[in-house]
Amino acid sequence: MLLSDRDIRAEIGSGRVALDPFDDAMVQPSSVDVRLDRYFRLFDNHKYAVIDPAEDQPELTRLVEVDPDEAFVLHPGEFVLGSTHETITLPDDVAARLEGKSSLGRLGLLTHSTAGFIDPGFTGHVTLELSNVATLPIMLWPGMKIGQLCFFRLSSPAERPYGSGADGSRYQGQRGPTASRSHVKFHRTHVE
C-alpha cells in the first residue's frame, strides 16, 4: 500500500521512518521530495579497459566535492553518481522507491538508471545514478530537489530486513554516493 502524506507524516512523527534533515514542506500528496547533496563520484574511464562487475575496481570512480554555492555541471552523455542530502531510515515493514522529478526529466536529467528500490531496514544516503540525455549541459545545484521518495507498507514485516544478515548488506549506512560493490558476493549461475 502506497502511503499518503498523512501516513508519511505519521510514520516520521512516530520515528519509525526517519529522514534527516526533515523538512515538512517537502511532503507531497504521496511522496517526500529529496534534495541533492554536494558529493559526486566521477568515472575515471582511463583506469580500466572494461568494467567488470565480478572484480573489485577501486580506481573506477573518484569522489568530487563541490562548494555548497557552486553547481556541478553534468555534460550531455555523462553518467555520475550523486546522493540525497537526506539520510533515510526504514523499519522492517516499510519499503521506499526513489522516483525522478518530472520537471528535471523534461530537461533530460535521469535520476536513477535502475536502482530506485530501497529495502525495509535500510539506513543511509540514497545513491543517485545521474545521466544527462539532453544536448546541453545541466547544472546540478547542491540542495536542489532531485527526486521523490514513495513509501510502501509491506503486507507483513520482512523476515530479514536489509542490514540484518550475518554478512551485513553492501550499502547499509552509506554516506554520500557509494561506488558499486557488485564484486562482493558476486553471483553467476553456470549457463550451458
UniProtKB/Swiss-Prot annotation:
SUPFAM superfamilies: dUTPase-like
Class of the enzyme per the UniProt entry, highest EC level: hydrolase
Entry-linked InterPro entries: dCTP_deaminase, dUTPase-like_sf, dUTPase_trimeric
Region (Disordered): 162-192
UniProt subunit comment: Homotrimer.
Family in the record: Belongs to the dCTP deaminase family.
Its biological purpose: Bifunctional enzyme that catalyzes both the deamination of dCTP to dUTP and the hydrolysis of dUTP to dUMP without releasing the toxic dUTP intermediate.
The name this protein goes by in its record: dCTP deaminase, dUMP-forming
Organism for this UniProt entry: Beutenbergia cavernae (strain ATCC BAA-8 / DSM 12333 / CCUG 43141 / JCM 11478 / NBRC 16432 / NCIMB 13614 / HKI 0122)
Gene (name only): dcd
